[in-house]
Amino acid sequence: MFVPFLIMLREGLEAALIVSLIASYLKRTQRGRWIGVMWIGVLLAAALCLGLGIFINETTGEFPQKEQELFEGIVAVIAVVILTWMVFWMRKVSRNVKVQLEQAVDSALQRGNHHGWALVMMVFFAVAREGLESVFFLLAAFQQDVGIWPPLGAMLGLATAVVLGFLLYWGGIRLNLGAFFKWTSLFILFVAAGLAAGAIRAFHEAGLWNHFQEIAFDMSAVLSTHSLFGTLMEGIFGYQEAPSVSEVAVWFIYLIPALVAFALPPRAGATASRSA
């Protein structure tokens, strides 16, 4: 439940910030009449992401067992790529995202008789990018942790992001976004490492990867996945009490370079914003 909550909080807050920045800019430049048009783009993006997520989730339930495992592995790999890209992309563009959005709004509203649709599509693509990232991660998360709690966590995270977005827009709160994105990014890298190890496990169960399947270690006597804490670790970080050598290797092969890259100072002009 916690991982879907955190991911949807972060992704939802990114989308909320985009919408808030666009709405604030429209009001500040005496173009508040276009805010309704902006919301059309937001709703279309939300409908696309929701529909795509439901379609993929319902379709995969019809797959035979091996194809189901293969699909789970592919979705996990896609989720790892998206999460990693999300972390480092936000590091790179967060300082300039406000200027970029304002320039995009100006460009959209200068396109003659079609500027309304241009604004709709600009907002649609900006919000849909965040939503599609969430779709693939949630598909991977729901496959690893079944039941009602992961969807509930995702909905709570999204609801919290919406509330925070409105509070930021109205000026009711000031949030240290630099610290928020820094620590959630670090957490997400550990989540992605667990997904990468889970992808190897899924490919093995699909019959595609049968190398280094010896048990690396057995922690069942110390931290069983049947215990409360073990269950939490499994749901959050993909913890396995008796992982294979290949799972452990993939976990380290992904996580060590990712942490090193994350620890390096961002390039000039790409430092994170401090607050909003």
Swiss-Prot record:
SUPFAM superfamilies: MFS general substrate transporter. It is a multi-pass membrane protein. Residues 23-34, 91-118, 169-179, 266-276 are cytoplasmic. The keyword Magnesium does not apply. It holds the Pfam family FTR1. It is found in: Cell inner membrane. Its main location: membrane. Belongs to the oxidase-dependent Fe transporter (OFeT) (TC 9.A.10.1) family. This is Ferrous iron permease EfeU. It comes from Shigella sonnei (strain Ss046).
